[in-house]
Each structure stands twice: as structure tokens, then as C-alpha cells.
């Protein structure tokens, strides 16, 4: 069953309504699945270029520092052993690939669960536009955002073609801008409220709603994998 949401103007008035498709905005949120998808997304952003040198890679230390017996000291074979300052590192980090395989169906299910959670909490808004006219105005954008929500962190979903709104919003602190095609679970969850422009909302709904492989819930096998 679809839910309707008021479309608000920059001054807070109502300018019609939009229908929220149930298969996108009214599904059961799978916390374990959302966690897995977010962890995978953050892991994909890691460079994995960290590296340390072992005692065999550190320069120097090729000569035995002193003879084996007769000095009263513990025997040593190299000044580049781990116990020495400037020596090699034991079991230190080495370059690796942190990326995890995340099926597209799981990403879609996690995103829909996150959006549904925001709708149920009254933290998703649809607006007609951000600023009027063709001239960007950060002041107008700030006033409009505070009219729609008092949340500390706000995710605004708008098309890159909405250049005036994009330029007006991009300098606002704690306001994150994203194109509908790039909307993801992490950005929805890390921000308190989600604000769609009407044009971006229509584009987002038209996209995933057409895909036959885009499901509102993960399969039982995927859910079991997420819970492990």
C-alpha cells in the first residue's frame, strides 16, 4: 500500500503530494543486512597501501653487533632485530585489498530498508525546489533547509542538472548533496534527515522501480549470510 507525502516549498507551504511506492519506502529494515552493506562500502574506500618493513627489509644490520660469548650481554645477530630501535616490525600491516563482494540485490534491499526507516520516523521530505530564480543563494538555501527540518545532518538528493540549487547548497555545513543515481545506504544512515527535490524523487523512483532484479528484501540465503 502506497503512502503519500506532502511536497513542500522553500517557505514551508504545501505544493501537492507525491506517492511513495510501498516496494521502495515501506519494507522491513534488515539491520544486519544494512550493517554488512555499510561495512563493505566503507571498506571499498580504503586504499590498503599501508606497509611496514620486516627485519629483512630494513637497511643495515648485516653485521653481528658483538661476539656471541664473553660480553655478558644477551646474544644478538643484528641491530635490525625487532627489539632494537630502528629495527624491523613483527607482523606489521602489509598492502591488501579490503573490498568485499556485495551483490546488487543486497545493496538495493539495504537502501530500501534505510529509506523505509526514515519514512516511518518522519525524516524523509520532498520539496518542490530549493531556491527561486536563476541566481544561486546560499542564504536562501539555508533558510529553506531550516524550514523543512531541524536535523543536524541533512542529506539533500537532487539532480546535477539543478545547478542553481546545487551551487546554493554546497557550501552549507552539515548538508551533503548527492545525485539520485549515487544514493546509498551509508549516506542515508549517517545523515539524520533525507530531503528529495521533486525532480530527483521522480527520477529515483522511476529507476529502481523498473528493474526486475531490484527487490525490496534479500533472499533467505542472503539474509543468513548477513546475520553470520
Curated annotation (Swiss-Prot):
Residues 45-102, 208-228 are annotated as: Disordered. The keyword RNA-binding applies. InterPro entries: Ribosomal_uL4, Ribosomal_uL4-like, Ribosomal_uL4_dom_sf. One of its GO terms (biological process) is translation. One of its GO terms (molecular function) is structural constituent of ribosome. It comes from the Bacteria. SUPFAM superfamilies: Ribosomal protein L4. Residues 208-221 have a biased composition (Low complexity). The keyword Ion transport does not apply. Keywords: Ribonucleoprotein, Ribosomal protein, RNA-binding, rRNA-binding. One of its GO terms (cellular component) is ribosome. Pfam families: Ribosomal_L4. One of the primary rRNA binding proteins, this protein initially binds near the 5'-end of the 23S rRNA. It is important during the early stages of 50S assembly. It makes multiple contacts with different domains of the 23S rRNA in the assembled 50S subunit and ribosome. Forms part of the polypeptide exit tunnel. Part of the 50S ribosomal subunit. PANTHER family: 50S RIBOSOMAL PROTEIN L4 (PTHR10746), LARGE RIBOSOMAL SUBUNIT PROTEIN UL4M (PTHR10746:SF6). Belongs to the universal ribosomal protein uL4 family. This is Large ribosomal subunit protein uL4. It comes from Saccharopolyspora erythraea (strain ATCC 11635 / DSM 40517 / JCM 4748 / NBRC 13426 / NCIMB 8594 / NRRL 2338).
Amino acid at each position: 500500500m502506497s503512502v503519500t507525502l506532502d511536497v513542500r516549498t522553500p517557505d514551508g507551504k504545501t505544493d501537492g503530494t507525491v506517492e511513495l511506492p510501498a516496494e521502495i519506502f515501506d519494507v522491513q529494515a534488515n539491520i544486519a543486512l544494512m550493517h554488512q552493506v555499510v561495512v563493505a562500502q566503507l571498506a571499498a574506500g580504503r586504499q590498503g597501501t599501508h606497509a611496514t618493513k620486516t627485519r629483512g627489509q630494513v637497511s643495515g644490520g648485516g653485521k653481528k653487533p658483538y661476539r656471541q660469548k664473553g660480553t655478558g650481554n644477551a646474544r644478538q645477530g643484528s641491530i635490525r632485530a625487532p627489539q632494537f630501535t630502528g629495527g624491523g616490525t613483527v607482523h606489521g600491516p602489509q598492502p591488501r585489498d579490503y573490498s568485499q563482494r556485495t551483490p546488487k540485490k543486497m545493496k538495493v534491499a539495504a537502501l530500501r530498508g534505510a529509506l523505509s526507516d526514515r519514512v516511518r520516523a518522519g525524516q524523509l521530505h520532498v520539496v518542490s525546489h530549493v531556491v527561486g530564480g536563476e541566481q544561486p543563494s546560499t542564504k536562501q538555501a539555508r533558510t529553506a533547509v531550516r524550514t523543512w527540518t531541524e536535523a543536524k545532518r541533512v542529506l539533500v538528493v537532487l539532480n546535477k542538472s539543478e545547478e542553481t540549487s546545487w551551487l546554493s547548497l554546497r557550501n552549507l555545513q552539515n548538508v551533503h548533496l548527492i545525485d539520485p543515481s549515487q544514493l546509498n545506504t551509508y549516506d542515508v544512515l549517517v545523515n539524520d534527515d533525507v530531503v528529495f527535490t521533486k525532480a530527483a524523487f521522480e527520477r529515483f523512483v522511476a529507476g529502481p522501480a523498473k528493474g526486475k532484479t531490484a527487490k525490496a528484501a534479500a533472499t533467505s540465503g542472503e539474509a543468513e549470510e548477513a546475520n553470520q
